[in-house]
Amino acid sequence: MKFFIDTANLEDIKKAYKLGVLAGVTTNPSLVAKEGIKFEDRIAEICQAVPKVESVSAEVTPDAVTAEEMIAQAEELIKINGGDEKVTIKLPMTLAGLEACRYLTEKGVKTNVTLIFTVNQALLAARAGATYVSPFLGRLDDISEDGVLLVAKIAELFDVHQLDTQIIAASVRHPDHVTRVAMAGAHIATIPYKVIEQLAMHPLTDQGIEKFAADWAKAPKL
């Protein structure tokens, strides 16, 4: 399973990229709004900061409700950073979003259909040609449904029908989510930087480092 970072914060993206584990970036209008910068400018900055990733998701804005409006926005977004091929158009899981997805796919544009909460939604998006689908774990957990089980069902369905669409586990809130979606068959987990930090940490690791340091301090030196 690959890792994307879910943020529009440039410093967090740069820190994650330096670790050598990052395969992509996902953003949304809410994340960009927190940064207080023009959307297109931030996407361009992200593309420049992570030259070797496979995807930078740029979502159409909420005021684009028809397929035509989404496509018009997408055609501007794919020009970012000189037509950077990493730019992936993120579309909502609506009928208009599916129509836009099919059109963009036929034009060779990568797409990420987001706000997936059912297997049927994922299947529709895959059949519309989506490069990625993004089921939301945490939001399902919030209403006492099993987000990880949804990922597992989508993965099984895609395998049975030999669909190439990749599953991005989104709304990932803690390390256990990451472990479970990896075992459930997600191709990618998109996670905030704080979860990346949590994945790398364990108290026994810290204790081991401290023990090695203490022992080394006592060792004879030449």
From Swiss-Prot:
What one GO molecular function would you report for this record? aldehyde-lyase activity
List, alphabetically, the HAMAP family matched. Transaldolase_3b
Which GO biological process annotations does it have? carbohydrate metabolic process; pentose-phosphate shunt
Among InterPro entries, the record links this protein to: Aldolase_TIM, TAL/FSA, Transaldolase_3B, Transaldolase_3B/F6P_aldolase, Transaldolase_AS, TSA/FSA_arc/bac
| Biological function | Transaldolase is important for the balance of metabolites in the pentose-phosphate pathway.
Subcellular location(s) per record? Cytoplasm
PANTHER family xref list: TRANSALDOLASE (PTHR10683:SF36)
Keywords per UniProt: Cytoplasm, Pentose shunt, Schiff base, Transferase
Q: What is its EC number?
A: 2.2.1.2
Q: Which family does it belong to?
A: Belongs to the transaldolase family. Type 3B subfamily.
Q: Which GO terms describe its cellular component?
A: cytoplasm
Pathway entry: Carbohydrate degradation; pentose phosphate pathway; D-glyceraldehyde 3-phosphate and beta-D-fructose 6-phosphate from D-ribose 5-phosphate and D-xylulose 5-phosphate (non-oxidative stage): step 2/3
Among NCBIfam families, the record links this protein to:
fsa_talC_mipB
Q: So what does this thing catalyse?
A: D-sedoheptulose 7-phosphate + D-glyceraldehyde 3-phosphate = D-erythrose 4-phosphate + beta-D-fructose 6-phosphate
State if Transferase is listed as a keyword: yes
Q: Does the keyword Transferase apply?
A: yes
> Where along the chain is the active site annotated?
90 (schiff-base intermediate with substrate)
What does UniProt list as this organism's lineage?
Answer: Bacteria, Bacillati, Bacillota, Bacilli, Bacillales
- Gene field: tal2
Which organism was this protein described from? Bacillus anthracis
Put simply, this protein is called: Probable transaldolase 2
**Catalytic class of the enzyme:** transferase
